[in-house]
Structures are given as C-alpha cells and as structure tokens.
Amino acid sequence: MLLTITSCEIESAHITEPTINEENGHEFVDLGLSVRWATMNVGAVKPEEFGSYFAWGETLPKETYTEESYTYKATTQILPLSDDAARVNWGGRWRIPNPDELMELIENCNWTYTYTPDLNLYGYKVTSKINGKSIFLPTAEVFSGDKITSSTMYGYGAY
C-alpha cells in the first residue's frame, strides 16, 4: 500500500490559530483530531494533485516499484523520521500518520466519494464530524513495477 497523506503533530491541547495554517511552508487543516492534516499530498502543488509516489520507508520517488527495487526492509508500522517521506521532503514536524491516527481520521470524519468532471478527478472529501472542516484525498493511480494503473473510477487508489 502506498501512503502519501501527511500529518503534523500538535504541541498543545488548546488550539487558537485559524482553521487553515502552515507548518514549514505547507498548509494544514485542523480537523479537531489529535494531529493536523495536510491539505495536499507530498509532491503535489495543489490539493487535487496526486503528488509523488513513495514506497513505504523510502523518501525519494523512483521509476520502478518492484520487490527488487524496494530498499526498506523493516516491517514496522511507524517509521523512524529519517525514513519518513513527509519529514524528509517537507521538514518541520511533518510525518506520515501512524495507524491509530489513520483510524481516528476514518472514525471521526464523513467520507464522501466525489467526481469533478472539469478536472476528471475522483477522490474523497473527508469532513470532520467534530468541527465540519475538510480535506480532499484524490484517488491516485496504482504504480506497479514501471506501470501506472488507473483505478480512480472505482473509488480506490493509493493514499
């Protein structure tokens, strides 16, 4: 599975800044959860872009994604920051969300599958049940070997 969504740790329990803010030059949204969520994927310049493709534990995109080209062999679900694509590429306090944070996002948000015809774009609008703020997760194609397979019209993709 490919994850490019990112989160940013919260330093205090009481947050008073605006709903959309920045960490190290990248915007985030406070969904009222334990971490702040990026408005776009690593490697994207707009929320509707897929961003870069990363293998788990690798910090640079590559041209081929096969078992032979995979360099990260650890089986941990939480990456050391030196192997975290968000931290290495965006700096600051950015990092890939851990499984508990992903579950929190799933359980505390409404997920609406959407299609934007003028952009030919499928994805999920993820809206907080806590404060009504949202992020958009485009359903990206799946990169296998050196080929990209479109799977966006079926509601699944790589995140």
What name fits each language-model region?
Residues T4-S7:
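C-terminal motif of bacterial Sec signal peptides marking the signal peptidase cleavage site
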Residues S12-Y159:
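Conserved positions within compact, well-structured domain cores
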